[in-house]
Swiss-Prot record:
It is found in: Host nucleus; Virion. Residues 1-43 are annotated as: DNA-binding. Self-assembles to form the virion icosahedral capsid with a T=1 symmetry. This very small capsid (25 nm in diameter) allows the virus to be very stable in the environment and resistant to some disinfectants, including detergents. Essential for the initial attachment to host receptors. After attachment, the virus is endocytosed and traffics to the nucleus. The capsid protein binds and transports the viral genome and Rep across the nuclear envelope. It comes from Chicken anemia virus (isolate Japan 82-2). This is Capsid protein. One of its GO terms (cellular component) is host cell nucleus. Induction: VP1 and VP2 are detected 12 hours post infection, while VP3 only after 24 hours. It holds the Pfam family Gyro_capsid. Keywords: Capsid protein, DNA-binding, Host nucleus, Host-virus interaction, Late protein, T=1 icosahedral capsid protein, Viral attachment to host cell, Viral penetration into host cytoplasm, Viral penetration into host nucleus, Virion, Virus endocytosis by host, Virus entry into host cell. Residues 6-47 are annotated as: Nuclear localization signals. One of its GO terms (biological process) is endocytosis involved in viral entry into host cell.
Length: 449
């Protein structure tokens, strides 16, 4: 039975599992006065359409022997996409490629670590470089070891999608590791992250705060809508690179409130989350007689598209997303920011412990660090962002679009996000070397006693 103690001003304390827990108790006269108003609050109305936190249940897991708190603080720039020079694109279709101002920020420890890593050519775009590197082209010896000297293998493959938010972020991490840059000059893999933490495990995600501000004015009406969702609740799929085997990779289309109700292996009908970027194959006409006006038909292999899909501005607004107006459409103040706060584990399964390094493996390799062996890339929350406009394509559902630009020595950001995140690592190993086992087992080579 837990001990309870009363404190002044209506505070309530309970001693449970080795610590004092503070619970807020509203005064009696306050509760009954505002009981009728709480039923029709704005937040309760929005939760009827989309509940950002479906809830968790507590699991009786032991507290760690020792803990270490990790804090992240930084800024994320949501920029417009770029395209390679037009003379290097196949067929000259670069003049007809458009992108949408959408983004998706996943809250997981892996991407937060990538956001605080070295700012190099393949891991980040822009920003200061932590150290003096050689960047004189691919003819030097450093091109084989330093990532900022490498050139893309194929100039037709996109380097990143808006889901890789950590590429355009500058994040500080506390506590810092002064030897991380020299040990890992390139982008860290799951194997390197597991070795950096050693025997620590991810005990819980404490809190993450987002403050989003629209920075680009697009016409007379261009607010930025942002919605925070728990886990992978509304994620259609993650970003993948283009490959010739795209037809054999299955796609999940059964997310709530989007129109997708089944599983498909290829051509799905576009809804408010997927724009018709992959046109269907034209019908095969066997007759040689001219039928009407001759037009140029393109099949699915002659068009460029992306599997990475996002929520449109209209969908986010219908789910109760917040709006942030850019400067010029509204005076800049604290209310100009969209504030989002994510607390707790955010895992509907209720588990608190997460594996950083798989147990029972002596040598850590990439195969062991892949899901579900390692949970560094477990998404606790997801922030969906889209900018609206009064003039947009019909299948974009009010989302602002733009023509892809060639790479220039500056980036054009349409939103800025301030981030603060707190994580806690735990150690389950007993730190007492004088403990003994109740029974010892011995084994001889070749025989079993």
């Amino acid at each position: 039975m837990e001990r309870r103690a009363r404190r002044p001003r209506g505070r309530f304390y309970a001693f449970r599992r080795g610590r004092w827990n503070h619970l807020k108790r509203l005064r009696r006269r306050y509760k009954f006065r505002h009981r009728r108003r709480q039923r029709y609050r704005r937040r309760a109305f929005r939760k009827a359409f989309h509940n950002p936190r479906p809830g968790t249940y507590s699991v009786r897991l032991p507290n760690p022997q020792s803990t270490m708190t990790i804090r992240f603080q930084g800024v994320i720039f949501l920029t417009e996409g770029l395209i390679l020079p037009k003379n290097s694109t196949a067929g000259g279709y670069a003049d007809h490629m458009y992108g949408a101002r959408v983004a998706k920020i996943s809250v997981n420890l892996k991407e937060f670590l990538l956001a605080s890593m070295n700012l190099t050519y393949v891991s980040k775009l822009g920003g200061p470089i932590a150290g003096e590197l050689i960047a004189d082209g691919s003819k030097s010896e450093a091109a084989e070891n330093w990532p900022n000297c490498c050139v893309p293998l194929d100039n037709n493959v996109p380097s990143a999608t808006p889901s890789a938010w950590w590429r355009w972020a500058l994040m500080m991490m506390q506590p810092t590791d002064s030897c991380r840059f020299f040990n890992h000059p390139k982008q860290m893999t799951l194997q390197d992250m597991g070795r950096m933490f050693g025997g620590w495990h991810l005990f819980r995600h404490i809190e993450t705060r987002f403050q989003l501000l629209a920075t680009k004015n697009e016409g007379s009406f261009s607010p930025v809508a942002s919605l925070l969702s728990q886990g992978e609740y509304l994620t259609r799929r993650d970003d993948v690179k283009y490959s010739s085997d795209h037809q054999n990779r299955w796609r999940k289309g059964g997310q709530p409130m989007t129109g997708g109700i089944a599983y498909a292996t290829g051509k799905m009908r576009p809804d408010e989350q997927q724009y018709p970027a992959m046109p269907p194959d034209p019908p095969i006409i066997t007759s040689t007689t001219a039928q009407g006006t001759q037009v140029r038909c393109m099949n699915s292999t002659q068009a460029w598209w992306s599997w990475d899909t996002y929520m449109s501005f209209a969908t986010l607004t219908a789910l109760g997303a917040q709006w942030s107006f850019p400067p010029g459409q509204r005076s800049v103040s604290r209310r100009s920011f969209n504030h989002h706060k994510a607390r707790g584990a955010g895992d509907p399964k209720g588990q608190r412990w997460h594996t950083l390094v798989p147990l029972g493996t002596e040598t850590i390799t990439d195969s062991y660090m892949g899901a579900p062996a390692s949970e560094l890339d477990t998404n606790f929350f997801t922030l969906y962002v889209a900018q609206g406009t009064n003039k947009s394509q019909q299948y974009k559902f009010g989302t602002a679009t733009y023509a892809l630009k060639e790479p220039v020595m500056k980036s054009d950001s349409w939103a800025v996000v301030r981030v603060q995140s707190v994580w806690q690592l735990g150690n389950r190993q007993r730190p007492y070397p004088w403990d003994v086992n109740w029974a010892n087992s011995t084994m001889y080579w070749g025989t079993q006693p």
